[in-house]
Amino acid sequence: IKSYKWHFIPIIFGLIVAIIGIYFGIYSIGGGIRTTNQVLSNPQEIFGYKEFFGRYLSMIFTFITASAGGLVAPSIALGAVAGSIYSSFFENIPPLIFAIVGMVAFLSPILNVPITSAIVIVESTNIDYSNFVILSVISLISFFLNIFLKKIYSKIRVKLFKPTTN
């Protein structure tokens, strides 16, 4: 690309991600390993909507600029934070379970291999293999829900952008 204006796009989005990190906190930026480890090591500490929204925005802006940021680790972290938030509604169930379920549910549509997503989370979190079946079911549900929603959104897009004839 010979135009210099294209060099400013990553700089602008990089500054936006930096502002997101300042406003939403340290757990909203980065690869996601720190966030995931924090959720798994201290599940009683409930993350808020602020961290979730900040991580979601920083993941989008990093992906738009085609910067090295990935989708796998940030989506696992996003699922862990979502599970942490969701666990605040259920006091009788351990928060760690919700974090792991969120990790599987967010990873499956990204990788497009549901059973492998469940295996990756079971192996990386070192939980008991007796949970593998339920995590596989959750992974399959999120995978097929993603396929279903893609079909709906593509139909909506066709209807919205269909050329009108006069």
Name each model-derived stretch.
Residues I1-N166:
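Alpha-helical transmembrane segments and immediately membrane-proximal extracytoplasmic
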